[in-house]
Amino acid sequence: MIVAHGRGVHPDAGLINPLRSQLSEQGYATLSVQMPVLAAEVPGEPYLPLFPEAAERLRVAVAFLRGNGLKGIAIVSHSMGSRMTNYFLNHPGDARIDAWVAIGLSGEFTDPATFKAPVFDLYGERDYAAVLDSAAKRAAAIRSIRGSGQMQVAGADHFFAGMENELVRRVKQFLDSRLQP
């Protein structure tokens, strides 16, 4: 499983740590990728030119895991990491994955017809407005992708603060149901 963090942070920050560590303890091999970052206070739009670099990092991560014999590769991404993963999935080349968990994705899925794997769109009831306002469009975009779904977690904010165990439980349920052991 590849983990992609959000903007302005590192591969073990915030909710990434419990995802990476708890899912590893529960049998998932995890690879947390350092995504391209700008200063923490930089808003999302200046990140757009970095998306090709992010896609290359994800491509290399997929190739690394496949090269080491892993099957059933998923990407679990948060926030800006989800936007970068969406870009990657629009330009997959030979780096096919088997499932994608997009946590706190703002805006819409771009070109979901290019997605070849089930998508789990997971967000909090108290998430950012950009995430909440586009939830219906995201649900409609993945409706035709077999095995995909969307879930709003009651009480959760964008970072699942204080609800990390619930986040891990939901992600694990999806991965367990979509990836072959």
Task: Cite the ranges covered by each PLM segment.
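Serine-hydrolase catalytic machinery in alpha/beta-hydrolase-like enzymes
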Residues: 1-66
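Short hydrophobic segments within beta-strands
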Residues: 3-4, 76, 103, 122
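Residue-level signal for short, function-critical loop segments
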Residues: 7, 79, 125
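Short, conserved active-site loop motifs that form the nucleotide-linked donor/cofactor pocket
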Residues: 28, 73, 147-149
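Primarily recognizes the serine-hydrolase "nucleophile elbow" in alpha/beta-hydrolase
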Residues: 63-117
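The feature captures the conserved acid-bearing segment of alpha/beta-hydrolase catalytic domains
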Residues: 98-160
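C-terminal catalytic histidine-bearing segment of alpha/beta-hydrolase fold enzymes
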Residues: 148-181
